[in-house]
C-alpha cells in the first residue's frame, strides 16, 4: 500500500515539472487533527520565491480538485536548503562523498541516529563511513536523511 507521500508525489510530479522544477520530495507531518504537507522543489540555478509561489498555486488547485488529504492541512513549498533531505536512492547516489545524518526506524547497534560519509549505494543498502569503519544500512530502515552542510 502506497503512503500519502508516495501518492502525492505521483499526483503532483508532472505539474511541478511543467513549471520547470523538480519535485525533490514530500514530507507530511501530523500535529493533532492538522497536517503540514511540505513540498521540496529544486531546479538548475536554484529556486526563487516566485518558483515556490507558482508551485504552491498549481499544487493547491490540484489538491482542491483531487482531494487526497482528508484532514485539514497547511501546504508549504520550499527549496531543499543547505541541509537537503534525501528521499530516494538516486538522490543518495548524487551525494556520494558527502557527510550525511540518518535516522533509523529500527536501531542498529542500539543507535537510531548515525552520521558519516556517504560511501556507496548497492542493492537497496546505503554504506556510510562512521569513525573510519563502514556501516551498512537497509534503505527501507532509514526514516530520514539529511546532508550535513559544509561552511
From Swiss-Prot:
Top-rank taxon: Bacteria
UniProt GO BP: ribosomal small subunit assembly; translation
HAMAP family registered for this protein in UniProt: RimP
Places the protein is found: Cytoplasm
Lineage: Bacteria, Pseudomonadati, Pseudomonadota, Gammaproteobacteria, Pasteurellales
NCBIfam families documented for this protein: PRK00092.1-1
Keyword Cytoplasm among record annotations: yes
Encoding gene, per UniProt annotation: rimP
Primary localization: cytoplasm
GO CC term, one of those recorded: cytosol
Keywords on record: Cytoplasm, Ribosome biogenesis
Annotated disulfide bonds: none
Protein's UniProt name: Ribosome maturation factor RimP
UniProt record similarity statement: Belongs to the RimP family.
Function according to Swiss-Prot or TrEMBL: Required for maturation of 30S ribosomal subunits.
